[in-house]
Design a protein with these regions (language model features):
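Structural secondary-structure packing elements that flank or coincide with functional cores
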Residues: 1-9, 81-158, 225-293
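Short, well-ordered alpha-helical segments
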Residues: 40-44, 58-73, 87-95, 206-219, ...
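A structural signal for well-ordered alpha-helices, especially hydrophobic packing surfaces
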Residues: 20-23, 27-30, 34, 52-59, ...
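Long, amphipathic alpha-helical coiled-coil segments characteristic
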Residues: 3-46, 141-190, 293
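Residues within HEAT/ARM-like alpha-solenoid scaffolds
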Residues: 17, 65, 163, 167, ...
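Histidine (H) residue identity feature
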Residues: 47-49, 85-86, 112, 166, ...
């Protein structure tokens, strides 16, 4: 599978009845809530905990996350009188309805794109008083797929590779500073792209190559003004620098969340040429664009 829209309904079919019953029970417990009684809140939380447990046998990370956050919100309402508002229960009921609609949609053949749950997920998190989640929070592309090298991997020993990556990282950091401080953003983005493309050539192994090949697509899009620059994207650029440092220090472990975030922003564009287009085709991201915020 290359995108989250492909989904095996088998395991969900086995537990769908249990999920429906528990979600219905959670909604029923809250239907006539009087604004103060904590018993319905605890009952609804318990039913959502049952839903969360049942979901562990299916690959529905976003659905599980929304369920867990909604359960936590109910538990906090039961424990903290200042959080007991009818508006908050309304949010919970809409979250339950969104979960039911999403699961029903999957069973009816709707695309599996958990980004559709982002608006209600963000509202639940806000009701809890948490930091706003990243726009890519419910974006789950298949980061295990690998891109093919056009040239053989560079035959470098560890010391030579470290030196070369160190040089590329220094260039990236200079460009990142220009970009973040908006002093000469275009020059900064050009340096960042050149540095990432150099690391792409130096990357050892298929997994590292695929990540840096993808990151180069994002840098190209930034330089061309093909993706809106927001604070989340700036954070992603900073985390790319940290990933560069890890590689320079000899670690081949990839941060899956960073990979997802890079792909999320690459998916924003619809250009038919350039590295970004190659990345979107490789990961079939075009199919998800209509669900992006």
């Amino acid at each position: 599978m290359s995108v989250e829209m492909d989904f095996d309904l088998g395991p969900l079919t086995w537990i769908k009845g249990e999920l429906d019953n528990a979600l219905d029970a959670a909604g029923a417990a809250l239907a006539d809530w009087n604004g103060q009684d904590i018993t319905p809140l605890k009952a609804a939380a318990a039913h959502l905990h049952q839903v969360y447990g049942a979901l562990q046998i299916v690959d529905l990370q976003g659905v599980s996350l929304l369920t867990s956050e909604t359960e936590r919100l109910l538990s906090e309402m039961a424990e903290q009188v200042e959080k007991r508002h009818h508006e908050t229960v309304d949010t919970v009921l809409r979250a339950i309805a969104a979960l039911k609609a999403y699961l029903d949609g999957l069973m009816a053949g709707a695309p599996h794109a958990e980004l559709k749950l982002s608006p209600i997920y963000q509202e639940v998190v806000a009701r809890r008083g948490g930091e706003p989640p990243a726009p890519s929070e419910l974006f789950y592309p298949d980061t295990a797929t690998r891109a093919s090298r056009q040239e053989p991997e560079m035959p470098l020993d560890d010391a030579a590779r470290t030196r070369a990556i160190h040089g590329a990282r220094s260039q990236y950091q200079r460009g990142l500073l220009l970009f973040l401080q908006n002093r000469d953003a275009m020059a900064g983005l050009t340096q960042m792209e050149l540095a990432v493309r150099q690391v792409e050539r130096l990357a050892p192994g298929a997994a590292q190559f695929t990540f840096w090949w993808t990151a180069a697509g994002l840098m190209e899009m930034l330089r061309r003004g093909r993706v809106p620059t927001d604070n989340w994207l700036k954070r992603v650029c900073g985390r790319v620098d940290l990933q560069m440092r890890r590689l320079m220090e000899g670690s081949r472990q990839l941060a899956d969340r960073l990979f997802r975030d890079v792909l999320y922003y690459v998916a924003q564009d619809d250009a038919s040429e350039g590295r970004g287009a190659e990345v979107r085709q490789h990961f079939q991201l075009q199919r998800l664009r209509r669900f992006l915020q």
